[in-house]
Design a protein with these regions (language model features):
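Charged helix-capping and loop-helix junction motifs
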Residues: 115-118, 142-149, 195-201, 236-239
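Glycine-rich phosphate/adenosyl-contacting loop at the front of the ribokinase-like
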Residues: 1-56, 64-66
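Gly/Ala-rich phosphate-binding loop of Rossmann-like dinucleotide-binding domains
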Residues: 47, 153, 262
């Protein structure tokens, strides 16, 4: 079974307008509401590709109920822990002459709630796949991903991590099956400017040397770069199209990679499907279908 973890899901309220004028009333041209969160996005695309999975994480309040109802309507399996306080956050994404995001904080997560998540994680079996995606809420120990991976290190579980900076660097010692930073996140991790594919490849190799089995670097319009545990290097170009939406493209790439690998057991084919899924979402108003 494939499991995804979204610690701080959201309702994404996406609005489009010609221009955003601060200090005055603005009228939108179009508005949509979507369940959000990197792990939830991965679950959505995996389901579209025919791979049943279970979404784990935390929800709360009326907004959390909306997320669950939306996922059930799409025949997505979820096993969220319902918190007794607050409400699942609402993120406002404004698309005008430039994109602006206003993200909520989310509810408090107690130690008791965390233990409920650990109990679910402990039930994973050999051969399962676990996707840890996104940020960790400020109310939670920033070692949470490390703690999860430590609990599973004696099991044969493929763990995929899509996180930034120290959240990612600190789990490499547990040899994740796949990590997927983008090129900008790679620059931030090493405090460098990467000007070429060769530069990106060199620093991706550093992540591999630190413990990651496979390193997938998404590069926006420049495609994606994959370094495999078999010492292979693959580069995928991006199909031509009009970019309508950057939200969820990286998550779609992760889902496509997992599905492609399960389909063929070949990393090159996994990259191809991952890149195709990422582009499909980028060329859509919402996640690809």
């Amino acid at each position: 079974m494939i499991y995804t973890v979204t610690l701080n899901p959201s309702i994404d309220y996406v609005i489009e307008l010609d221009s955003l004028n601060h200090g005055s009333v603005n009228r939108v041209n179009e508005e949509n509401i979507y369940p959000g969160g990197k792990g939830i996005n991965v679950s959505n695309i995996l389901n579209e590709l025919g791979y049943k999975n279970i979404a784990l994480g935390f929800i709360s309040g009326f907004t959390g109920k909306y997320i669950v109802d939306s996922m059930i309507a799409k025949n997505l399996n979820c096993d969220f822990i319902e918190l007794s306080n607050g409400f699942t956050r609402i993120n406002v994404k404004i698309k005008s002459n430039e994109e602006t995001e206003v993200n909520g904080n989310g509810p408090n997560i107690s130690e008791e709630d965390l233990q409920k998540l650990y109990d679910k994680i402990d039930n994973l079996k050999n051969g399962d796949i676990l996707v840890l995606a996104g940020s960790i809420p400020s109310t939670v120990d920033d070692k949470l991903y490390e703690n999860i991976m430590k609990r599973l290190e004696d099991k044969n579980i493929k763990i995929v991590v899509d996180a930034t900076k120290n959240l990612l660097l600190n789990v490499l010692k547990y040899n994740p099956f796949l990590i997927k930073p983008n090129n900008h996140e790679l620059e931030e991790m090493f405090n460098v400017k990467l000007n070429s594919i060769e530069d990106i490849s060199r620093y991706a190799k550093k992540l591999q040397d630190m413990g990651a089995r496979n390193v997938l670097i998404s590069m926006g319009k420049d495609g994606a770069l994959l370094l495999t545990e078999n010492n292979e290097v693959f580069l995928s170009n991006t199909p031509k199209g009009t970019v309508k939406n950057s939200v969820g493209a990286g998550d779609s790439m992760v889902a496509g990679f997992i599905a492609g690998y399960l389909n063929t057991n070949k990393y090159e084919e996994a990259l191809k499907l991952g890149a195709a899924c990422g582009s499909a979402t980028a060329f859509s108003n919402d996640l690809a279908t």
